[in-house]
Amino acid sequence: MKHSLRYLLILSVASFLKTSPAFATNPLITDQFTADPTARIFDGKIYVYPSHDIKAPPEYKGKPDWFVMEDYHVFSSNNLTDWKDHGIIVSQTGVDWADPTAYAMWAPDCVFKDGKYYFYFPAIPKSDGENEGPDAKRPEFRIGVAVSDTPYGPFKPLPTYIQGVTGIDPNVLIDKDGTAYLYYSLGKIFVAKLKPNMTEIDGEPMVIDNLPTKGLLEGPFAFERKGTYYLTYPHVENKIERLEYATSTSPMGPFKQAGVILDESESGCWTVHQSILDWQGQSYLFYHDQDLSPAFDKNRSIRADKLFFNTDGSIQKVKPTLRGIGLVNAKSEIQIDRYSAKSAGGIVVSFNDEANPLAGWKTTFSAANSWVRFNDVDFGRGKQKTIKVRAKTGASSTLEIHLDSEDGPLLGRVKIGEATDWKISSATAKKNPKGVHDIIVTQTDGGAVEVDWLSFR
């Protein structure tokens, strides 16, 4: 009863979070740590169901320097730019069968069928009391289901986990004929048919063969495209995970290894976890890295980039970007540290506050003619009159903003006066472009200048 009351309190608090926006570019969410994103399209919106990394609280008694995850949020967007946090949808304290002290709510999934939304999640079950003591092993992961009438909840966890399934990383594929398949991992990748009730398996799980046998294999995400079934999965080929895929003509295989989608992260992040969807004619890869926690890869952040298929159905390798996806409104505070391209020298990106990475980044221009390009800025009807820049510099400096190329039309020239603290400098816009354009921000003279954001108002 104590845990149930706490769970209701959490959901009540979450209701106040529904108007809290997240931000665009990569990472997608910057006010908390998020990982393992499953992206789905429901009711004309994209919903992302990630896991939620947190700093270990005092009561955490698990493995040191490990993944600490106590609940799930869901985020939605109708434009790939502005992400809305709908708050907590499931918590370890609100699942009857789960250990409320395990902090092991790992990668989830959510699907829609017959008027209901089914949220699948792994968790450690409560001990049965027979295996206790200092040398006791904790129970193995199980996969639970929570059900809702809407994609953002409230979700009601079922009283017990799916029987006959032991593992993590649940993923559900609903085939064209309505049959649902549950994929999950435990050293290997398994698949099982689900009964029409979506909460029980129909028959025994089977191992998917013909996948890599050396190195960790986990995190399945399956989808169908033009008659081909794609099984994507993280795999440790060397020291850390990269994202690979296999294909089949059947959702249960046999699958054939087909290639690499995403190379090992340059950050050294040990894990990767993925989902792929099509939105308005473009495919996207959702994944995670450690952008907001460069020194600790158990506090991760979700990202997204465009993904492309070749004419033969093979997947082109994705190159991670800072800029990410979606349009950015010219009136917003444009984070140019998430640039699309930069000059060969004179540009450094660092945290605004090294003690608080969630405060975001700044861009330092330290050489004449150093520049950054930021693509896909939406100027709308072109009514912006002023350019504002939040910056600071030890000596006066000048920034020029051009349209579409370094020698393109000059939008404005902003003089940054000497200031040791952040201040907003302004200049009159010389042009009022309409529609979507790239902008190029160039330091033309003066001392090194740190820029937090710029905006067209």
Where are each of the predicted segments found?
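Bacterial N-terminal signal peptides
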Residues: 7-18
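Carbohydrate-active catalytic/glycan-binding domains of CAZyme proteins
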Residues: 23-413, 419-457
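Positively charged n-region of N-terminal signal peptides that target proteins for export
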Residues: 1-6
